[in-house]
Amino acid sequence: MNPNQKIITIGSVSLTISTICFFMQIAILITTVTLHFKQYEFNSPPNNQVMLCEPTIIERNITEIVYLTNTTIEKEICPKPAEYRNWSKPQCGITGFAPFSKDNSIRLSAGGDIWVTREPYVSCDPDKCYQFALGQGTTLNNVHSNNTARDRTPYRTLLMNELGVPFHLGTKQVCIAWSSSSCHDGKAWLHVCITGDDKNATASFIYNGRLVDSVVSWSKDILRTQESECVCINGTCTVVMTDGNATGKADTKILFIEEGKIVHTSKLSGSAQHVEECSCYPRYPGVRCVCRDNWKGSNRPIVDINIKDHSIVSSYVCSGLVGDTPRKNDSSSSSHCLDPNNEEGGHGVKGWAFDDGNDVWMGRTINETSRLGYETFKVIEGWSNPKSKLQINRQVIVDRGDRSGYSGIFSVEGKSCINRCFYVELIRGRKEETEVLWTSNSIVVFCGTSGTYGTGSWPDGADLNLMHI
């Protein structure tokens, strides 16, 4: 074979190999694409179902003429499917509470457009915490802010922001409400929003951004709810609602809600005489609430909710150091585990407490007769003994001379346990401060800690002389 024939032969062989490789790559590409689309064809869900993301193997072949290179295998990363929360972890052991968040809304409103609010609270989804409040349909530096001490108007809406973000003009108005509760079941938010006439109000149940159910006032006397987070366990959410006399016998019901739909209603049973503005927390397998007795007791009512059989048991926090305002001073106060103590029972303020074995953690105003100052502490045997007055681990959150307001609890699930946190409403303006014509608030938030902590005071801090009148 002469040199020219050798060159022609080698060229022919190379061309043949290249052609074969080319067609092999086309075949591999066609097979890969076909298999990819076949997967979605065979796994496509019905029209009314959400398609779940599943890991997919994708082959990518990098080709150069003549030579076949390595094939790389990649996994498609899918979001973890949402699951209902069950809150089955134990409660975290704590030594006290550490500072977590403060929104400074009133101070900031001196130089910007911040909503006029009251009745704030905090609740968390599995990833983030959010702050809520009932807006008054106006900003503070707006003449509509005059006379916003009123609780119920058609302009009030439920506001929602990430925790620590003040309610600015871009804040989402979740629903129309002058009383509310919100909670996340692990998949979506549920909002309970009450508005309308005092004698014929409507509660709307909004789930995942859609109105799902509603209920009308059953006693025609200011239907109202918690003003803090509800609780969802395995897809069933519970909310405590009261309708009727604010200083006498009222009609309290516990609603069980699944994806926004009311599936059951239980009447309050047990020994609690008057129940309003409950602060609820998951106590697996049920829900426990500590509430406000606006009629007979300065000791706080307890409502225990059984998720499975819808049964309700109510009683009172035993602690001899009581949590409501007004109340008697600690040396002369008394309590009872089953009944109201009949001490300074009229009026009151939303508050919280939670059990820790036989002990109880609680927060309350420092002043016994008005909403001034705020403190937290643990009462040894305060969950089981009405004579218990041994207080430990006391912390001042707001000094005695500074204003406070409502307070409530929210729960945060950690890797190994469930932590309890609380917020304090810091009310400013009317009726107590007449330099201005409005009433609004900021908040401060603390969470349980097993570590060490110092001292301080975290009041609202706004100078009303610098504020819009």
Task: Briefly describe each language-model feature range.
Residues 52-77:
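Serine/threonine-rich low-complexity intrinsically disordered regions
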Residues 79-113, 118-129, 133-173, 184-223, ...:
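Beta-rich carbohydrate-recognition and catalytic domains
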Residues 2-38:
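Single-pass membrane-anchoring alpha-helices
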Residues 414-418:
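Surface-exposed, short loops/turns at beta-strand junctions within beta-sandwich domains
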Residues 120, 179-181, 226-229, 276-279, ...:
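Beta-propeller and closely related beta-sheet repeat lectin domains
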Residues 32-51, 80:
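Membrane-proximal alpha-helical anchors
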Residues 239, 419-422:
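Noncatalytic modules at the cell exterior or secretory-pathway interfaces
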